[in-house]
């Protein structure tokens, strides 16, 4: 541990650093010869610290370098007060008439863009201005050594402000272009490695103790419910108003109940950590804020918590008659496969009607008394002890799937349902789990009834709802609304009607207009005994307008005219694609970009959108093109954030990378059709041209940076591939966006 103290002073000029070098002198300064001059300079330093910031630049470098008192007294709030113009966060939009993909544009225009009003977050440009002013005020120019080094620091600060929630910033990014020879205060050290180590530690201290301290002290940094991983910066006074308003609204509505200090202590042993009470925080949404409580395990033993989650999931599966569960892609694929098969058997010709609804405040609307009543009725009808077997799906490769399937066992430890479903076969992977329903019910009741949170000195008890942040919150919410559908919506889920549910999102599809009207009336009225009310702004239908036949649900676009599921490419209108990925790779950037591009592409082309039982040739081409659209948007982000900062981009390498991913798309499509025992009639050249064409489309997208060299290289490849396309298949290429 070492530090440097100027002669004649008692305050350390440098903070403490951990150093691996053997040198004992960090900064070697010339010793003043005149004692009177030293005393005068010392008094000048102290006067400048007392007065503030006006005379700080006139103080010699040797006496104010990282003065601790000076740094502690600095407060950049006055800079914020001088900023009159507030920049709102803007989303990239696609201008009308600029592209020929009308289908995709219509889906994008149906998405409401977030609009922040008076409580808008600050733009990163404003925060950047504040931080640069702080660095100019505190750090003398001699520390940077040159304007080049200061520009590198500003570039690093800008990069930090634009990082995603889960991204990391490496010190190597900052030190890569720093000219250590310009830092004359460190040139007395002869070893280059020692100089670099010292400069790196100084720059690291500036980042942690000045830049990050200013961010923590002047801004509230949080994520947004609809902005994915992007960080938003609020003024603390503005965010405090939002926080107080959201908290008072929950107290006035009866969701939270105030407690005294003495009464709250009795609940502390049931919280996330023994003797501690979790603190509530809010995440901004379009209209209000979402409460988050880090309840986690809630004081329950891990083994009991594991059994409770499995038990609740099994209870939710028993409520199948109310709705088709579509929480993941596999469940939605099975439900849509059965429904399309039923419609094809009836030879339907009428148009389909749909009603989509969303529960307003799904987690906060759960009634504790109703939840306990539902659980009690289920527990009373079960045996004191249950055995659940652990199984997994056997894949075509001979390996076992990582996802565990739990099946109820009888007294002879035999599964209560078949382990073979068509070509799917389940194999046992572990010993049975013994579950005691009554014990789990008591634990859940204690957990839900005794939820206590804190907000500063205010202590509150959750009187209604389950907090988002608990381990069992999602399972309790799923069971609650599955029971509601079984009690109130089972009459609609018959015949050619289908009610899909993904936790709190509902989609009703029917051939009958009267049935659709009945469901719409039910959603408007809500379900009072479950305290369930639908969000009218998110409720839409095509009862009065049959032209609308596409509806987004559970991450896909449901086309009711062609009965196909399309890739949800219109999600690009929600925000900048950069914040949908984690960019934490420091080494091998080319391989990292290739891996991310492949992951983005294949994640969109799941068996859900490629199932040959309901996917036609036009739908397959549309999904491949849409996956190319999504991959192209993220490729631009990867080029801008990963490859461009390291120097000139090899565009031929990037074009070859896109083509290689296109060949993997062909193999993915073939694999899905092979598992469905269906011959693929579309040649590989058509699929490859479609995917690469989608990527080329994003290279000329109006609202994104353009890469003409990559676009040119890909077009050359497309021209060579077009010659190989059979004449009877060329008709698919000009109509890529069409789905009917």
Model-derived segments and spans:
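Core residues of folded domains in eukaryotic genome-function proteins
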Residues: 274-278, 350-355, 462-464, 468, ...
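Short amphipathic alpha-helical segments embedded in low-complexity Lys/Glu-rich regions
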Residues: 388-394, 498-500, 523-524, 537-544
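Active-site palm subdomain of RNA-directed nucleic acid polymerases
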Residues: 316-317, 321, 346, 383-384, ...
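Conserved two-metal-ion catalytic palm core of "right-hand" nucleic acid polymerases
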Residues: 1-467, 672-674, 678-740
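Active-site and adjacent loop segments of nucleotide-processing enzymes
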Residues: 464, 525-533, 542-740
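Generic preference for well-ordered alpha-helical elements
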Residues: 150, 356, 368, 372, ...
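Short, conserved phosphate/pyrophosphate- and ester-handling motifs at nucleotide-, phospho-/glycolipid
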Residues: 469, 473
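Catalytic lobes of large eukaryotic enzymes
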Residues: 385, 519-521, 526, 530-533, ...
